[in-house]
Structures are given as C-alpha cells and as structure tokens.
C-alpha cells in the first residue's frame, strides 16, 4: 500500500471507508446510500453534490471489489504517467460525466414512459410519482473506472492482458473496444438494473478529455 501513488491510495481508502461506514450507519437508521447516491434530477431528493458523492457509494461487496481492483491495477499506472493532479481531475470528470449521461438516459425514459402518470404500480403497491422517482438512485465508481480503462487502452494500446475466460492474451485496445461494445449491447438489450450507459458515459468523457489534452499539448495521435 505504501508503494501506491497518493491519489490512487487515497481513492481506495476513501471508497472502502465509505462502504463500511454505509453499513454501520444503517444500523443506526441512517441511509447514507440514499443521501449520497445520485438521484434523478426531477426527484425531490436530488442535489448537485450527488454527482460527486455517488462515486463513493457501492451497492455490495462485489461492486466495490471489482471497481477498486480496477483502480488499483490501472489507476496507479495512469497516475504515474500523468501525475496526481491530472489523474484526479480525469477520474472525477469521468465519474461526473457518467452521472450526467445516466441522468439523460433516465430523463428520456421518464418522458417516454412515466411523465403522463401521477403514480406507479410497483412490487410494494401503488406509490406517488415523486416517491418512485426518489427510488431511482445510482451508486458506484464504475463510470470513473470505465474512463480509467479507456485511458489505459489509449496510452498503452499494445499492452498484453489476460482476461478470463479468454485463453490467450489480448491487446489493451481490443479489450477496451470489446468492453465498450458489450456495454452498448447490454444497455440496449437488457434490464438488469446496471447503469450501462453511465459506463459508456465515463468512457466518452474520458475520450473527450484525453483528446483535449492532446490538442492542448500540441496535437499528435490519440494512441501512442
């Protein structure tokens, strides 16, 4: 842990502390996940600060484990290349961008499905629309993590990676492209409760930021 770059290490620590703090607070009747998770912007529980705080909330152990594993594996490399300030900026912008895309997707869904109703029939019965909208909460660092994956694939496109269950190494750029295509297909064709378009949003904002930095520094190819 002492060998980790500063921002990567602190991101891991903060996320883990928030995760365990969430469960401790629950025992005292405090729902931190609801307070800090990202609500739909038309819901009464929404506030702008949630675009940052939602990144530090996670739904369960597997959720935080895989996100933090990716931060540890790829984030430390990016921080060593970019430095702490640029890496933290990138991480936060990807996470915020993912949240904005999630809000946009939910808004489109709201306009096409819910906007003409005053209440919604759920598993718990019929509830008012405002109460239903407050249930639409997004949590997790996955948007920022997908931005990290994109950046790694752009900075080190030909790095060899072993990905289960593929029996042979693949280049990082193909790994990233494959993940993006998978997220798009899942976003279009599944209803699994995962914010797939938010993941793509993190990658999109990461791409925009990297291209901007490249042009600001004198241009050149996106991949090197």
Question: What are the residue ranges of the model-derived segments?
Answer:
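A detector for small-residue-rich transmembrane helices and their helix-helix packing motifs
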Residues: 1-224
């Amino acid at each position: 842990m002492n060998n980790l770059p500063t921002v990567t290490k602190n991101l891991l620590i903060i996320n883990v502390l928030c995760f365990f703090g969430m469960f401790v607070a629950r025992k005292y009747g405090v729902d931190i996940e609801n307070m800090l998770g990202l609500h739909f912007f038309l819901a009464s529980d929404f506030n702008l600060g949630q675009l940052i705080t939602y990144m530090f909330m996670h739904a369960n152990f597997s959720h935080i484990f895989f996100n933090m594993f990716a931060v540890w594996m790829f984030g430390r490399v990016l921080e060593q290349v970019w430095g702490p300030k640029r890496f933290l900026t990138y991480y936060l912008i990807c996470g915020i961008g993912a949240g904005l895309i999630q809000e946009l997707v939910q808004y489109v869904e709201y306009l096409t499905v819910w906007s003409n109703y005053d209440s919604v029939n759920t598993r718990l019965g019929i509830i008012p629309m405002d109460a239903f909208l407050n249930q639409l909460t997004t949590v997790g660092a996955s948007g920022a993590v997908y931005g990290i994956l994109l950046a790694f694939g752009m900075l080190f496109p030909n790095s060899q990676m072993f990905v289960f269950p593929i029996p042979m190494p693949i280049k990082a750029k193909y790994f990233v492209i494959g993940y993006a295509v998978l997220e798009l297909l899942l976003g279009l064709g599944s209803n699994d409760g995962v914010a797939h378009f938010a993941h793509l949003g993190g990658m999109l904002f990461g791409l925009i930021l990297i291209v901007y930095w490249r042009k600001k520094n004198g241009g050149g190819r996106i991949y090197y």
